[in-house]
């Protein structure tokens, strides 16, 4: 924008919110500790290798590194905090950086911050947190890219590998939910979405290539 121009006003159509919640950046870290802001149960981790919508380019691309974002709702990507009535935001005062800078009429501010200083789980959980080691082990035993490769083959050893990975992924979630007493909704932040849930998207992405 020219310095003399006023920023375009939001028409509050809600389209950006329906396309998915924002990824979080380092600047958003204080919001996770702000009363009325999002908490860990409101987040989902998209892991390296997952197909995800690049909101700047407008297309699905596999992630090179993980991102943490506000989760969707009702089985869709519509932001958890989007309120259809009035096209309002339930956490407007504590909305993340991408929401603050986005204008669908001029996306240059979003483009400048989009891939910069994105938060990861290790940034959000304090050093020494007891679950960090388990998260790392899950990432090693259940990598998205490795699971995607196993989906490409119907060989007996690959079917066994898929079953073992799916079992490990399910068991670690059950274990943490039972032993910790945490809200089960936090599991999608800690371990990303279940591999079983990712399988259709990974298969569809493979067919597009």
Q: How would you name each of these model-derived features?
A:
Residues 1-208:
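Hydrophobic scaffolds flanking metal-cofactor catalytic centers in soluble metalloenzymes
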């Amino acid at each position: 924008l020219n310095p003399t121009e006023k920023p375009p006003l939001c028409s509050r159509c809600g389209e950006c919110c329906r396309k998915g919640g924002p990824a979080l950046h380092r600047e958003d870290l204080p919001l996770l500790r702000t009363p009325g802001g999002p908490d860990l149960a409101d987040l989902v981790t998209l892991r390296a290798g997952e197909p995800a919508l690049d909101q700047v380019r407008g297309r699905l691309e596999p992630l090179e590194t993980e991102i943490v974002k506000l989760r969707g709702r009702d089985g869709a990507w519509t932001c958890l905090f989007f309120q259809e009535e009035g096209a309002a935001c339930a956490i407007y005062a504590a909305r993340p950086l991408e929401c603050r800078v986005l204008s669908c009429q001029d996306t240059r501010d979003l483009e400048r911050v989009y891939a910069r200083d994105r938060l990861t789980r290790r940034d959000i959980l304090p050093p020494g947190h007891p679950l960090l080691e388990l998260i790392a082990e899950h990432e090693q035993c259940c990598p998205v890219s490795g699971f995607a490769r196993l989906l490409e083959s119907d060989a007996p050893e690959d079917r066994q590998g898929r079953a073992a990975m799916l079992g490990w992924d399910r068991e670690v979630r059950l274990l943490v939910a039972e032993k910790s007493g945490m809200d089960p909704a936090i599991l999608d932040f800690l371990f990303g979405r279940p591999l079983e849930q990712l399988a259709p998207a990974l298969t569809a992405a493979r067919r597009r290539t």
